[in-house]
Swiss-Prot record:
The active site is at 43 (nucleophile). It holds the Pfam family TruB_N. It comes from the Bacteria. The keyword tRNA processing applies. PANTHER family: PSEUDOURIDYLATE SYNTHASE TRUB1 (PTHR13767:SF2), TRNA-PSEUDOURIDINE SYNTHASE (PTHR13767). Responsible for synthesis of pseudouridine from uracil-55 in the psi GC loop of transfer RNAs. Keywords: Isomerase, tRNA processing. It catalyses: uridine(55) in tRNA = pseudouridine(55) in tRNA. This is tRNA pseudouridine synthase B. Coiled coil: none annotated. GO terms for biological process: mRNA pseudouridine synthesis; tRNA pseudouridine synthesis.
Length: 302
């Protein structure tokens, strides 16, 4: 079957045990799409939302890479492992003497800006080599702490020694490390036993589909599962252009805001999504110094 020029966003519910790249390749084969990419790696041991971008949507995948993420996670108190999750060897065990009130208090202390030391079992590179390669060789290298932001952190359930929480966090946050640090704050250590991503920027797991469901579907049913390209941009203010302005915009011309029928509700230097009079997405622009400057164009008007 010939590859198709398909534009849109697939909200995939990735299963445990499959890498993000393997999930992307399976979806790409099912859709027979020419161009596809994912929006940030989800570890094989994690499940949940993995947005996949097809065609013109790939132009905006970076926006989701930078977006906040939401996860539901379960940690087991009293046990530390080499990897910070259930795959690692046990380092030590400690008594769990805290109660639910102490757990809630500990979670509250991690809301806001925090400093995390990246785990040794991670893909971050040192001298061109991923940290996990050093870790597998029994080596530990010095890592600098990185500032991340925990937007929200809520207790879902507490059945000690297991604690399930929901976290919304900035790009670059390691939930494994968060669980370990919470365990240390409680004086007993912890490791992650479950991780499920439920949100990426404005996108949620609620409308996601599994690979098994896609396997069983017809091509038309699969195509109907695709969200439009602008699903990635729903948090941006929008502006509509008449036919003449739309033509100029698609030729990369900067437009004076005074030429528009309605000025976009955007902060100075803010990004806006741009449509023509028929509500077709033309691209993304920046509104700055009285001018609407094209940033990325959608060539199909998808």
């Amino acid at each position: 079957m010939a590859r198709r020029a398909l534009d849109g966003v697939l909200l995939l519910d990735k299963p445990v045990g499959l890498s993000s790249n393997d999930a992307l390749m399976r979806a790409k084969r099912l859709y027979q799409v020419k161009k596809a990419g994912h929006t940030g790696t989800l570890d094989p041991l994690a499940s949940g939302l993995l947005p996949l971008c097809f065609g013109e949507a790939t132009k905006f995948s970076q926006d989701l890479l930078e977006a906040d993420k939401t996860y539901e996670a379960t940690m087991r108190l009293g046990v530390r492992t080499t990897t910070g999750d259930a795959e690692g060897d046990v380092l030590d065990t400690r008594d769990v003497s805290c109660d639910e009130a102490a757990v809630r208090a500990a979670l509250a202390r991690f809301v806001g800006e925090i400093v995390q030391v990246p785990p040794m079992y991670s893909a971050l590179k040192r001298d061109g080599k991923p940290l996990y390669e050093y870790a597998r060789a029994g080596q530990t290298v010095e890592r600098e702490g990185r500032t991340v932001t925990i937007r929200a952190l809520a207790l879902v359930s507490c059945a000690l020694p297991d604690v399930t929480f929901r976290v919304t966090c900035s790009k670059g946050t390691y939930v494994r490390t968060l669980a370990e640090d919470i365990g240390e704050a409680l004086g007993c250590g912890a490791h992650l036993t479950m991780l499920r991503r439920t949100g990426v920027g404005p996108l949620t797991l609620e409308h996601a589909v599994t690979l098994d469901a896609l396997d069983a579907a017809t091509q038309d049913e699969r195509d109907a599962r695709l969200a439009p390209v602008d699903a990635l941009l729903s948090t941006f203010p929008c502006v509509k252009l008449d036919a003449a302005l739309a033509t100029r915009f698609l030729h990369g011309q900067r437009l004076k805001l005074s030429e528009l029928a309605a000025r976009p509700d955007a902060a100075e230097g803010g990004r806006v999504r741009v449509y023509d009079a028929d509500d077709r997405l033309l691209g993304v622009a920046r509104a700055s110094e009285g001018v609407l400057a094209p940033e990325r164009l959608v060539v199909t008007g998808a």
